[in-house]
Amino acid sequence: MKQILIVEDDNLLNKTLTYNLELDGYTITSVLNARTAAESLKTNIFNLVLLDINLPDGNGYDLCRLIKPEHPDTVVIFLTANNQESDQIRGYEAGAVDYITKP
């Protein structure tokens, strides 16, 4: 079964993503900050990380840079309100394969 890590500090969006992806049969670990995400990554292998950029204890760019060397096969997709082209470029440079802006 596919394992997904959701790193999103908006509790409602976090729960909505978790609910819908679990309905589709995915195993979800959802966290609200970078520290807890880093801890989860030490003990789990995820196929996908859905990652917000603006987190209360750090940013998604730095977390993505930590993920990729240790978990090169893990796909990272940014899901963020940051919609500037420069933000997207930073996301791809950090190792993400896609960048989705939320309203």
Labelled PLM ranges:
Residues 1-103:
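N-terminal/domain-start alpha-helical segments
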